[in-house]
Structure formats: structure tokens, C-alpha cells
Amino acid sequence: MRVLLAALGLLFLGALRAFPQDRPFEDTCHGNPSHYYDKAVRRCCYRCPMGLFPTQQCPQRPTDCRKQCEPDYYLDEADRCTACVTCSRDDLVEKTPCAWNSSRVCECRPGMFCSTSAVNSCARCFFHSVCPAGMIVKFPGTAQKNTVCEPASPGVSPACASPENCKEPSSGTIPQAKPTPVSPATSSASTMPVRGGTRLAQEAASKLTRAPDSPSSVGRPSSDPGLSPTQPCPEGSGDCRKQCEPDYYLDEAGRCTACVSCSRDDLVEKTPCAWNSSRTCECRPGMICATSATNSCARCVPYPICAAETVTKPQDMAEKDTTFEAPPLGTQPDCNPTPENGEAPASTSPTQSLLVDSQASKTLPIPTSAPVALSSTGKPVLDAGPVLFWVILVLVVVVGSSAFLLCHRRACRKRIRQKLHLCYPVQTSQPKLELVDSRPRRSSTQLRSGASVTEPVAEERGLMSQPLMETCHSVGAAYLESLPLQDASPAGGPSSPRDLPEPRVSTEHTNNKIEKIYIMKADTVIVGTVKAELPEGRGLAGPAEPELEEELEADHTPHYPEQETEPPLGSCSDVMLSVEEEGKEDPLPTAASGK
């Protein structure tokens, strides 16, 4: 029993963990149009109005949104877009690129200093002065200050650029404030480009920062003279390099160049400033570089807000001088639909890119048979089991109901068609009734004498044809009553429209021949005769009087035999067929006694 309770408890905990835990926070954001739910940070974020750009990934208040300025413009403290200064003059170089919240900073090019400063630039630049004879350089010239000279010490060689570099006395030379030329043999070893490797440059810089007054280095040549600045400077030697001020480095042209600054809030230092390489800056974590600059980034923007199924594509920024254009207003960078573990930083080295690729290739595939959802971190999360159960149940109910309604509709349609076929059968074309009697009218003497002179053709034409098909009882009776009876007119004279054909008077049940057969159904056959009753005391032998003709006309309706069995319900349209015997001769009417 305890094992069963423990298993039920584990199942309950698994069901609780399968459901998303941040749904209450997500529901609170839906009702507020000024906020939206960020699945990456799992909290509500402020939606910046149109024309403003968020300064962080999930802004919380209107102050976290800033105005979007055009390129080469920055947003000043008064929240206005101001143009950045230009460094288009020949004596100016760019020190700090133009950013979204700071202007571009220009300074005098190497070998010159600024005599008249301006805001973020210099109005007038002059060349560094040269120390006169007997003077050596105390402080080399910078972009802001001129060269400072001092009298040479007795034990210092005037060929060296600084008294800290050389201690050997020499004479007959004039101190100069210009950089010492570097020999080609040592230039490749002393001046190392940044692209070759940052680690080697840092190691070289650490070797060159030894104290110049160290007893182990004074007067002792180094094994690698090109990388050792502490060796003595012999007379006329060109192995001594120029010593730059702090925050300056010696470029490939042998000039001291200012290192870039990472003082902005959205930048961090990636590589420090060395004697032969500049400082390298990159965007802080959570931001990407939209506009790059030399050894830095001009504009950093937050990571785009992607859906739960997508993550941000890592951008390959291993090369420094690669130029990236800013995305248009209102758009976000691309999102990769393929989930990856973690987000790549804004700038990665080739070694880190290879490691990321190897880790991505070793990721195990996720089976697609089970319902899987991707969280903001890219890890698969199984959906709740009851959701799949309810979906299958709803599908089964819908399919079953549709099949039942379809079958029921077909059955009802079949029944309705059967009822319509019984009540409204297909009407067959009935032949036109042509009642023509060519027999001459019989005289009263012939009727009295009982002479029977008849013709078969006249008897066949003198009778009215009965309808071949009757639908309902009322329809058949009305149709028979509507048929007019015509009597044969004597030869040579026109027949009156009110002349009636002579009815056939049969003997009282002496004729056993079948005159007509009424077929009601396939299993019901009724045999009977048609009777024409005459008034008592009257015969057909007398003269045709008007009263007799009216009585015969009024009483000419034939009487059909009644059906003995009651028809079933719904058989109102039973078909009755009248079949007459062929070749049957009508018996002659008997003579009526005259009064």
C-alpha cells in the first residue's frame, strides 16, 4: 500500500511540473495593453511607444525607452537628436566613435598636439616641437600636450629618446624628439599585429614592463633585443623603441596612437591596451553590436525578443574590422528557429566558435513522437498528458456524431422517397377515348320481335373504355364520372351529343365468363362484373323517349365490386388495372314488355 501511495505521489508531482509555472504572470500581462510578457526573462515588460527604442532587454518603465535617432546623430541630455562632430580634416583622427548617447570625439593625429581645443574635437593642431642641443625628451608629445624637454644628464646618451631607456654615456650627438627608426629585423618581433593573437601580445607586454633599474637588466644584453626595452642604447644603434605614454600604443608606422576607450555604459573591455596594440571593446552581455568601429562598437542594441521556439542567431564577430549595419527602425534581428543551448556573445573568437559548433553537433536529437515544447532556454519540456487525452476524446466524439448524423439522414431520405413514390406514382399516358358507334338505331319492332342482329365491331366501339390505372379511390371515381358517354348515331344522320350507347344487359348470374379483373396488389385479385341497373318496368325495346334517356343518363355510372380485404395503411396509391377478355361477345339485350 505504501508503494502505491508513493507512486501516486510521484505521478501527481510530475503532472504539476508538466504544466507551465509562469502562466499566472502571463495572464496578468494580457489585460494591460502597455505591457507584454517576455518568456526569456519570465516577467511583464513595458511596451515602448512608437518611435522609442528600449535601452534594456525588458523595460519596466517609460524611462527605459529612448528616442531613436538617425545615423551619425546622438541623443543628448535634453532628449534631442544632435549631430556628431566630424573628423574629416587631415590633422584629425577619430578617438571615440559616434554612439546613440554620445558624440564622436576627434583628436590631433600622431605627431601633433591640439593648441586650440573645441567640444569633442580640436580647432587647431601643431606638430610636436624638437628638443634643442643638450636637451633630451622628458615627456613625449601627445595629442593634447607638446613635447617636454630637459637638460641631458652626464651619464645619459643623447641618442636615446628618454633617460629611462638608456644609461650609457655618449657624446657628439644631438637629442631629438622624434621616434627612433626600427630595423626590419626586429620590427616583426617587437610590433605584433592584434589579429595575429591577443595572448602573445599580452605576454610580450608583460615582458616589457620590467623595472628599468633592475640590476639583472642593467648593462646586460637580452637574448631577444627586439623585445627588451631595458637594454643599453649604444651609440648609433636603432634597436631602442619609442616609449609611449600610458593609454597609448605604438602602431605599425612607429607612431604613438591613443587606445580606444570603453568608458560607455554599454561597453566592456575585451583586450587591454598594450605597448603595441590598442584596447579592444565589446558590447556588454545582453546586447549586440549594431554599428561596429575600429577595436570597438559604435552602437549596441539589446537582444531581440524572440518567440519561445526561437533563439537569437550568434553573430560571428571574430574579425575586428567587419562592418555591421544597424537594423531598420521597427525591426529586430533575425531569430533562428533551431534551438541551441545558450546564447553566443556579441563577439566570439574562432576557437570559441569551433567549441560552440562541436557542442551543437553533440546535442542529442529530441524524439518527435512525444509532445515537446521549447522553453526560453532552448531545453525541451514535455507537455501535459491530459491535454493529449482530451484532444483525442473530442476528435472521437466529433467523428462519431458526424457518422451517426450522416447515416440517420440517409435513412430518413430513403423513407421519404418511398412515401412520395407511394402517394405520387408516375402517371402513365392514357390513350384518348374515342367512343364511336356505327350501328344503325334499332327500331321498336326489332326489339319486340327479339331479332338479334349485332355486329362485333359496333359492340366493341359502343362501350366506353375504362381507365387503365387508378391512383387513389377518390381520383378513380372522379375520373370515371367525368367521362362523357356517347351513343352511336344511325347511319346517314348526325348523332346527338346526348345520345347514349345502349347498355349491355346481362342475364342474372348466368354468364360465367370473366369480364374484368381488378388487380389491387400482387397478392390480391378481385373478379367482378359491371352492372347497369335499369328502372323497374322499363326496357330498351320501347321508343327512345326523353324521360327514359334522362333516367339512363343519370344512372349510367357503373358499379364496381367492393374489395373484401382492407388494404394496409399507406396504400392509398394502390394501382388498379382493368383487363378485359378479348373476343368476348356482349349478349343481346332482352326485349322489354311495353306498357
From Swiss-Prot:
Annotated glycan sites: 32, 101, 276, 336
Basic and acidic residues biased stretches: 499-509
TNFR-Cys repeats: 28-66, 68-106, 107-150, 205-241, 243-281, 282-325
Cytoplasmic topological domain: 407-595
Residues covered by region (Disordered): 167-238, 323-355, 438-457, 485-509, 536-595
Family: Belongs to the TNFR8 family.
Name assigned to this protein: Tumor necrosis factor receptor superfamily member 8
Organism of this sequence: Homo sapiens
Gene of this entry: TNFRSF8
